[in-house]
Amino acid sequence: MTSPRPLRIAVLCPHFDPDTAPTGVVISRIVHELAALGHEVHVVTALPWYREHRIEPGWGGKWVQRERTEWGSITRVNPFPGTDKRNLLRRALGFVGFSALSGLASLRGGRVDAVIAMSPPLTMGLTGWCTHLVRRGPLVFNIQDVFPDAAVETGAITNRHVIRIARWLERVSYHRAAAVTVLSDDLRDNVAAKVSASRRSRVHVIPNFVDTEFIVPADRRTPFRHELGIGDEPVVLYAGNVGFSQSLGLVLEAARRFPEATFVVNGDGAARASLQAEAADLPNVRFSGYQPKERVPEVLATGDIHLVPLKQGLGRVSVPSKTYSILAAGRPVLAAIDPGTEVPRMLAASGGGVAVPPDDPDAFCAALAELLADPADTAAMGAAGREWVLGAASPAAVARAYEQLVRGLQSGR
């Protein structure tokens, strides 16, 4: 029996290595794992911009940059970033501009066996479909967060005309795709409810993962801790986007109730300025910007307890990928998120942390008090989480799932 020929795949994504966005880390590893399986991959992405919301030094000067790799190619285009993260219109126009330019760039290169397009931004659905029309490979639409649901839930989008357009774009993108991949059963139910019954079998769950060789448990006494002026006291850490989807007011309330601990918010986003102003009278709260990728394991090791807070309703439309990274670092998770959704299920299965209802300061602080009171138990949670993630979130397994999905689309299954 002869082996099937290697696949030729086009990948359209808003971030790719060396960009530091979590979704960029995920898709970069998937691409490298697909290449390790012998496949040819051609990536169309943005110039690196995520950390400061501006194109990184050394990458400017051209709207389109192309490079050949051992496994295919990378085409990077201008993402039209805006430094004002609170200006939603400016950000939306940037997404549209990036989607259009990446779409034009993706039309080069001949026929492929599949087009994998990653959302958000939701506009990549139409970009992927246009690429499919020219390059003939079936469209696989990968959903990291369900949009516009998350934006509507948080009140980031309230204009009914904008919501109607976004819903239309979402519906069209799902129906044009040969397959839609989501991260959890909750997201599958959400997407399946928006497509016709005959198309629901096209929605597949392929979870995210973490690089457990890169992120490993390490000593809590890190240089990062020293840089922030923190001693040996317990550190409660939030790392990630500082936006309106995250209930970061819980962090400040906990800081008021637990002056013996230091609370670190590591990241940036539209809500950081207001959150930092609100924390001005809290001496046990530290803020720091995104760190380079190579420092991520060190940042994670700094925290004794890590936080995953999402506002009510968002646990059903989003699976924070940071949860996998925290577990890989051997640290316990305290999640404030909708019960019965993917993160609480993950923590229950792994023993790697606890979950409380969202937006409930008393429940949040009660759970944190228990974790702070028993360092030995929190260390055991961290070890259990690491053990679970080693077996449940393999990059190679995720790449094989995409390979099998594309093979199935080729054969009409």
Model region roles, listed by residue range:
Residues 1-70:
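N-terminal subdomain of nucleotide-sugar transferases
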Residues 57-64, 216-229:
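A short helix/loop element that forms part of the nucleotide-sugar donor recognition site in Leloir-type
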